[in-house]
Amino acid sequence: MSDDSFSSDEDWDELDTQVVDKIENEYHNNTIGLNGYSVDEYFDANDSNRYRLQHELDESAAQQWVYPINVSFRDYQFNIVQKALFENVLVALPTGLGKTFIAAVVMMNYLRWFPKSYIVFMAPTKPLVTQQMEACYKITGIPKSQTAELSGHVPVTTRNQYYQSRNVFFVTPQTILNDIKHGICDRTRISCLVIDEAHRSTGNYAYVEVVHLLSLSNKNFRILALSATPGNKLEAIQNVIDSLHISRIEIRTENSIDISQYVQKKEVDFFPVDLSAEITDIRDRFSSILEPMLQKLNKGNYYRIQNAKDITSFTVVQAKQAFLAMSGQNFPANQKWDILNTFDALATFAYPLNLLLNHGIRPFYQKLREVEEECFVGRSGYKKRIINHENYRPLMDDIEILLRDQSFVGHPKLEHLERIVTEYFEKEQTKDTRIMIFVEIRSSAEEILRFLGKFYPNVRPAIFIGQSAVRKAAGMSQKLQNETVKQFQKGEVNTLIATSIGEEGLDIGEVDMIICYDASASPIRMLQRMGRTGRKRKGYIYMLLTRGKEEAKWERAKDAYRTLQDNIVSGRGLSLSEKSYRILPEKFRPVCDKRVIEIPKENEEVVVAPKKVQLRTKIKKKFFMPENALNGFITASALGKPKRALAKSEESPFEICPVTYSIEQEKKLEKYKRVCLRGLDIHRNRRLSQLSVTGRIPHSLATKSIHSFLKHLNTIDSQKAQEWRREINNQFQVSNINSTDRDTKQPKMHDFRQPLHPNPMTTLKRKGQHNSFSYDKSTLFYDNNNNLEEDLPDVNISISSRNEEASKTKPFDDRQQRLQQLVEKRKRMKGMLI
């Protein structure tokens, strides 16, 4: 049932009657959701039957679960499948011990039990998705017609068709996440979710978001998580458990009792490598250039390492963070930024120094050239201090001389690598064998490829890197990656030089020797590298480690791996989830049916990619060309000929029907002609008899006065307007006679001041020299008194008797005074406007 719906009658039938009544009552009283709970959370808290089945169940198939015996039977696989069918399980097995087989068996049984539901297998990359899909075809016999491979390269319309017609999907996590968010994939139909490389399920990775979205509206789905190592630390493993609702961990190591018989012996040899004289000289000279910056940090006790030869980017960044957290808050801005920029510059040049010691002179030189380009493009004053150092340019010149020598070996590791690889392939019994070399950075991989290419055809090397472009170096396309893997599996390539992309997930094939060109401090990466060999026959592992820091890094990785495995097996420090709900009804107790699975013929056929179907009509292109420009193909003979003129269609002029106005309409028209001035734009709007209602703030008194005046003005007829015009003309004639007296007399202050309660009669009597004019004007005021009283019908104030009552009676109360002031203000406004 969805979070926001109560209308489904089928969901209500399985609930207890009392629970239904209670929910309906609270729903009608609008009390559900006030505490922030969703409908599913409310059901979880109040429903006695938490295992409501959402998917259509095949009851006959639910009586048993099928275990294929097409391949050799292994106890640990059988035991893990038995647990994974009924709980959310995290399976941690070394590489090559059949995690895909376990997932395929679980998927097959859920498809049998719930034939109309969705079975989803998620893998982080498209090559992994394709590989797992082909493996499931061969193991469980799921027909190809029921499966689909979905990634971002598949159009949305095609994915929508697959969701309507198929049930088993092999997808990348971001693709199905987008489909769920946009409603293309019905999340309530998913009954089984398999997650490959589950150690990625932390933070905001798409795995975590997919499981979260499914949990919001679907409690009937099983989760099976697969990984060689679930995490570097217990905190990371706990994050995976919480994100994927894991209720059980099935972990095996190469020393486990039920695993040891299926694991071939592996020989691990260490080759400690001493630095060459050239590398030592370059290290010392470059360290002396970094020494002034290091001493600057040492004086303030911001960085403890005293020797520039021992600095690393990691320790510099740690010291910078400690400075910001503790001391950096109390420093002046200039001094603080000076220290931070020094940290940044030192961390930038510490990384090339690490490349020099562990990978060689060429990667060191290439990295410094990249830093130089960054400095000249951006504003990097502190880094330029290193580049502009007097000893920096001579050092780079000497390195360039060394690299021009074709016989020069950039690091002693390459000499050890040459001896190991050439001797191994010279043996007769190892002509069909393969070697895989792991390296952290691409520049080292490219140098190894050039170095081993000299020993062709005994050594046939190929590089295997990621798709993303780094700096100026482009990555490998997915097509080229797949071709390289196939060539390695067929034996056309017998030495594969891989970065971290070769460590995770991909089925590279049979590898008899692993060479680790550098050490990784991560237990996950260490285990994944070593797990590539020793699957069907004895494996060899060679570690090429520079003496000192790289040796210590390897020892730390081994210790961390042992401690981590012991903690996982014992369960110390881990808390499992309780959200692993039962999906099959309790009355069904399926028993195991071991049988040979028939593989459909369609699964063995080579799939030809279908041609792309054009689902949308092409949009007609718009060419922004000048008028009368030639477009398209035109012959030379047609260039001199004039274009054929198109027939012009002459339209007849539009006839305007004569209109006669009535007498009243003519008067209105004349009125508008008189009012409208040149350049005045008048828009006749709808007449409002009342002012519109406002919100919290009422209309001002000025607005109300103007509205009342305009309303009154609209009621004036033409005869009254003519009378007013004559009276005003007479008043102007009288005022011109008395103008000489006013001009010679100095104005006084009371001539400009208006009283609070002006009375036209009393005010005009004070000015004896204006009696005739003032009396006429007061008459004009009193002509409008009736209309003013109509504007405020609730005000019972007599204007004619107001002055007499004011002298005999007590003052008015506050309300009457305010109303009186409003009436007189409107009178004053109308008189002024007229």
UniProtKB/Swiss-Prot annotation:
Its EC number is 3.6.4.12. GO terms for biological process: DNA strand displacement; double-strand break repair via synthesis-dependent strand annealing; interstrand cross-link repair; meiotic strand displacement involved in double-strand break repair via SDSA; Okazaki fragment processing involved in mitotic DNA replication; reciprocal meiotic recombination; recombinational interstrand cross-link repair; replication fork processing. Residues 738-769 are annotated as: Disordered. GO terms for molecular function: 3'-5' DNA helicase activity; ATP binding; ATP hydrolysis activity; four-way junction DNA binding; four-way junction helicase activity. Gene3D superfamilies: hef helicase domain, P-loop containing nucleotide triphosphate hydrolases. ATP binds at L93, P94, T95, G96, L97, G98, K99, T100. Signal peptide: none annotated. It is found in: Cytoplasm; Nucleus, Nucleolus. Residues 416-582 form the Helicase C-terminal domain. It is an enzyme of class 3 (hydrolase). A motif (DEAH box) lies at residues 196-199. Disulfide bonds: none annotated. The keyword Zinc-finger does not apply. Residues 650-690 are annotated as: Interaction with MHF complex. InterPro entries: DEAD/DEAH_box_helicase_dom, DNA/RNA_helicase_DEAH_CS, FANCM/Mph1-like_ID, FANCM_DEXDc, Helicase_ATP-bd, Helicase_C-like, P-loop_NTPase. Residues 80-248 form the Helicase ATP-binding domain. PANTHER family: ATP-DEPENDENT DNA HELICASE FML1, FANCONI ANEMIA GROUP M FANCM FAMILY MEMBER. ATP-dependent DNA helicase involved in DNA damage repair by homologous recombination and in genome maintenance. Capable of unwinding D-loops. Plays a role in limiting crossover recombination during mitotic DNA double-strand break (DSB) repair. Component of a FANCM-MHF complex which promotes gene conversion at blocked replication forks, probably by reversal of the stalled fork. FANCM-MHF also promotes non-crossover recombination in meiotic cells. This is ATP-dependent DNA helicase fml1. It comes from Schizosaccharomyces pombe (strain 972 / ATCC 24843) (Fission yeast).
